[in-house]
């Protein structure tokens, strides 16, 4: 299954994989959260697990604050900060319901968490302590940082754009342009917009500038759909990750495929081989050379027999990730 440009990590989590995140400054270290209640740190080139720490419930997301500190949250409502050098942990705070998302906002130096308790909380990582709680209209399903803005996707297909420097009001209230439940949002690196995916095999490319001439550029497309016995099977698009150098992005779906897209020319650049089961999470390394792919059954068809969960590390090339110059 794996070629010379790809390998599977040893000692994978023992249950579903919820999130994979590369260290901010190296493709050597990968943080992985899991339903087995663990957060694991892998040394990728050595293909070994460096460290593991536990929550008391499934961990739904994790993030690096800096190269030596991991943050994580999940079903136990607890937000933890773990020092990866000393193996010391700190219970930073809690939500009133499971924590679904954990993200670092480097431009304003805060951690943001989104929860099913219908709030986003900001945390000062230096102290560490709570720096504010902000009500959302519904359960938070996904969030993404765009410079000093925070884009929050909730139940009810709502999207809220917050200014992290002034959280006194919501900067923009939007509705998803897709008809079905939002699964993932990731911001463009140029801070001009975001990509949103749904459970119904679609992806939308949206722009933050509300002016009509910019809004004309937005579009949506179908993906992660397979014809089987002349019937189109439609799969959730669970994961999105941007390539830091080329501004292209990868999507992962419950069909087990990873696609890479050029949003500027509206083209698919490539599709990798089919992975054993659903793609639950994706992460490009900061330098864009490596893609971590979590192949992990997400119980779309209830508790049936399924392939074991695994993390694949793939070396990617410019041919796979760089936009093609449009024909003139």
From Swiss-Prot:
The modification Phosphoserine is found at residue 211. SMART domains: WD40. It holds the Pfam family WD40. Its main location: nucleus. There is a cross-link at residue 216 (Glycyl lysine isopeptide (Lys-Gly) (interchain with G-Cter in ubiquitin)). GO terms for biological process: cell division; chromosome segregation; meiotic cell cycle; regulation of chromosome segregation. This is Mitotic checkpoint protein BUB3.
